Amino acid sequence: MKLVQVQHPLVKHKLGLMRSAEINTKKFRELATEVGSLLTYEATADLETEKVIIDGWCGPVEIDQIKGKKVTVVPILRAGLGMMDGVLEHVPSARISVVGMYRDEETLEPVPYFQKLASDLEERLAIVVDPMLATGGSMIATIDLLKAKGCKHIKVLVLVAAPEGIKALEAAHPDIELYTASVDSHLNEQGYIIPGLGDAGDKIFGTK
């Protein structure tokens, strides 16, 4: 599995702000979008381009365009919605595929409850977004679902990842790519990432 920890100073700065215990919902939500955007920039660096001729202001001009790659953004409900707009800033024509997964607080296992996927998944690059990669259970289950529907090219974007989740994801899906702003220390007994961000879903949606 390709693992990329994005080292850009802006990513480090913005993620650091998100770790504050004093951060409010508005600021956390804005930063989740911004870091999601920066991760997307890194994750799409290998998209193929092709030369095309267009009519410029002074006549025909040769430009580079993305070579017809179909993309679907896959936010894992609910917290993944907080990163979705950051991806769409760069690929605004992407289709949106929604997967509902929540983690049972006792077993820590993923429980699926909703899916609405784009058509032609076998032809699309799926960019799966979720702020936290903790145990990896929800992410693995989501990728299982995408592959079962024919998707072959998958990239995962998370704000923070625990070593335990990375190891589990690599064991289950060694062919995907993982982009993260930080590889954190470990999971605590409750399955939360340390130091992490707290409950990203609650912070994005202003709930407890």
Curated annotation (Swiss-Prot):
The keyword Plastid does not apply. GO terms for molecular function: GTP binding; magnesium ion binding; uracil phosphoribosyltransferase activity. Uracil binds at residues 193, 198-200. Binds 1 Mg(2+) ion per subunit. The magnesium is bound as Mg-PRPP. Pathway: Pyrimidine metabolism; UMP biosynthesis via salvage pathway; UMP from uracil: step 1/1. Its EC number is 2.4.2.9. 5-phospho-alpha-D-ribose 1-diphosphate binds at residues 78, 103, 130-138, 199. Keywords: Allosteric enzyme, Glycosyltransferase, GTP-binding, Magnesium, Nucleotide-binding, Transferase. GO terms for biological process: UMP salvage; uracil salvage. Gene3D superfamilies: 3.40.50.2020. Allosterically activated by GTP. It catalyses: UMP + diphosphate = 5-phospho-alpha-D-ribose 1-diphosphate + uracil. Catalyzes the conversion of uracil and 5-phospho-alpha-D-ribose 1-diphosphate (PRPP) to UMP and diphosphate. This is Uracil phosphoribosyltransferase. It comes from Pasteurella multocida (strain Pm70). The gene is upp.
